[in-house]
Amino acid sequence: MEEFQGYFELDRSRQHDFLYPLLFREYIYALAHDHGLKKSILFENAGYDNKSSSIIVKRLITRMYQQNPLIFSANDSIQNPFFGQNKNFYSQIISEGFAVIVEIPFSLRLVSSLERKEIAKSHKLRAIHSIFPFLEDKFSHLDYVSDVLIPYHIHLEILVQTLRYWVNDASSLHLLRFFLHEYWNSLITQKNHITIFSKGNPRLFLFLYNSHICEYEYFFLFLRNQSSHLRSTSSGIFFERIYFYVKIEHFVKVFFDNDFQCILWFFKDPFMHYVRYQGKSILASKDTPLLMKKWKYYLVNLWQYHFYVWFQPGRIDINQLCKYSLYFLGYRSSVRLNSSVVRSQMLENSFLINNAMKKFETIVPIIPLIGSLSKANFCDTLGHPISKPTRADSSDSDIIDRFLRISRNLSHYHSGSSKKKSLYRVKYILRLSCVKTLARKHKKTVRTFLKRLGSEFLEEFLTEEEVVLSLIFPRTYSTSRRLYRGRIWYLDITSINDLVNYE
């Protein structure tokens, strides 16, 4: 038992004690401006002097600790138009600066970890598409799968407790706790859940959520490694490379019962596989569903008794892979049985042998994707292309390049689809929407403008991947065409496409 407790011990010597004074350093907000605020009003507002950012932060923190932090005097609004902004903007300023500071302990640990293990940073940053070759290789040999939505109703104190193991600065933690309680309501939607992965979410909350999820995953992987005769190999796939540097290598100290080894014995399963992206995870296993049920209740107990999150066991379904379609990262994946009959002739006797082989299929679901295109005003809810309003000073080449770029990104992201029919329809919607947009700008009919563009315009939308593959295989046109019709995984994609993120 001491062995397990030592495994979870935290290296207190690496705690950082003096992070609070960094809130008033100018370069911190330069970093925050670079990574998060970008072209925000903080650095572009008229009359704002970037040398006085620390003064502004001091005023904001002082007013936060007051009873009514949003009551500003008329003189403040006149002297500094910065205070005329809304409450969400104040929270963004502090959260962006605070996020840079709390990431310092993790970034230093990353550097020391990479130097100790002699691992290149690029090995830690895998592409999103690398998940699918893994699923393609493993899932055809597995039988049961669970699609788990990780609970996100996290109490504020749990998020603060996670940072306490890394930061021993009482002032910083007190400010963080006060800040979370003050601005938490701005992150709650009408459906009463936290939109963790929305674009407008501050970098700080993404960092806190990621660190919380990593703590859960370390408990999970620890139990997985202890319960299996085979050591699992894991590779990190970081969807917020700016926001979070590396998974924590140490665990929170926990206390186990005397029957811990007995509990582990019930979970022995060398064929358990785990994949996660954002708030969704997949558990897959071989043989009977009994072991999957045990892991299911283990996860429920872990969330309820350690993280204090109520999680109903009924939300985790155990399904057979051959009868279930898994929706993950914009693809609908499934394992299908392909039957083939082979006739064997031996002398005067002949035999018919029925071979059933499992095949991993990935299909692009067209209905959700059309809904995403409809929200972006490329088509209506039925998938009929419509013209998109543009600026009057936009040139025709800029409009065409924009549509081509969107089409190219979607084509690359969905290049792993087993069937290309849905992808062709998406290209058709974007192509016709581009033509209608140009016709609307020049006040001409679609037919007239399409004749003006000619057939070359159609080829740019329809045969881009085929041209690229023909350059790779210049002498074997049939090979490139066959590859174009098949699945292609691009290992340079590190973030999910905006039009795909419609879950």
UniProtKB/Swiss-Prot annotation:
Cellular compartment(s): Plastid, Chloroplast
InterPro entries, per database record: Domain_X, Maturase_MatK, Maturase_MatK_N
GO CC entries: chloroplast
Alphabetical keyword list: Chloroplast, mRNA processing, Plastid, RNA-binding, tRNA processing
A Gene Ontology BP annotation from the UniProt entry: tRNA processing
MF annotations from Gene Ontology: RNA binding
Family to which this protein belongs: Belongs to the intron maturase 2 family. MatK subfamily.
Role this protein plays: Usually encoded in the trnK tRNA gene intron. Probably assists in splicing its own and other chloroplast group II introns.
The protein's name: Maturase K
Organism: Eucalyptus globulus (Tasmanian blue gum)
Gene: matK
